[in-house]
Amino acid sequence: MTDPNRVEPTLTGPVLIVGVGLIGASIGKALMREGTDVHLWDIDRDNSLIAAGHGAGRLGNLADDAYRMIVIATPPAVVAQTVVERLTRHPQAVVTDTTSVKGAVLAELTTLATEHGIDISRYVGSHPMAGTQYTGPLTACSELFVDRTWVVAPRTDNRYDDVQQVVALARACGARVVSMDAHEHDRAVAEVSHLPHLMSILTAANLRRARPEHLSLAGPGIRDVTRIARSQTTMWRQILSSNCVEVRSQLEAIRDDLDDLLSRLNDSERLEEFLSVGQAGARKVAGKHGHQMVETTAVVVEIPDTPGALARLFADVEAAGINVEDLSVEHNPAREAGFLSIDVAPSRAEQLTASMRNHGWSVRS
């Protein structure tokens, strides 16, 4: 099939979004920003009303054959059944979904289509690789998909123009489109999304045994690692169950690595070898703008928790004329202050440190 990145298709509306939680409502807001006619439907009418009230579209009120695109953003467990229902109700529409597991949906959909004699060629699976630990239409954001990957999973029975409509949907939301087979997609998300989520949960679960005075020592590292463990459990149960084969394979590989690590703990040289393997894996993750990660040095500046302090600091960093590779903030639990870690090229760290001190900032050595 033709690479979807070679053309610039235009999305044809009206668009009906079925399921308006975080993802559905965010798609609605993004499309409304682009001037698309967006309609909303949710089994919980309150969700539709809230989303409509916050600019995600209007309540669906057109004839079934008027819609040209149906976006299914329901919980994973009901996606296949919902796709079948919408293919039947909307004969002129391309139907796509946003669920993070494609193979299981396609298998169930194929079974349902065979049982009911339904043509599923107008269904093109997709998956926007974006989200937060929050849920519901009140958390929606029109910028959620900007510069994020949106996987489109075409099949040989799809019409080219139908696939291009899903590509146009993703691009209208500001996303970067990647075309990928459904089963390859499921392995990929197990590696880069589902396994990391479970590692976050395992780390957070281990904290239940920690004493309160030990938890008081926690810094930004543990908060970063456990942040996604706060995500909604019902949705993640469905995601992990749907992709259980690929997730199990990843967990078994981690189990082997844990056994290897345990065998190395009393041997410093072998332990360092293992740590180096982790560094090599981290370097494979794309850095800024999708480029290879580069070596940086952190210049850590103390900032008071007062209005305007961060803006002044950013202005002074800009005045130094040094390119910033990354930023992170650590809060001081003992007093009303924080620390901004400014990652720059190692050759510029000393210059930035001197500039910050000249502007009156306290810099950690």
Question: What is the predicted role of each segment?
Answer:
Residues 281-365:
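A conserved regulatory-domain signal marking ACT and ACT-like small-molecule sensing domains
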Residues 43-44, 99, 330:
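Residues in the short beta-alpha loop(s) of Rossmann-like NAD(P)-binding domains
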Residues 70-71, 96:
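N-terminal Rossmann-like NAD(P) cofactor-binding module of classical short-chain dehydrogenase/reductase
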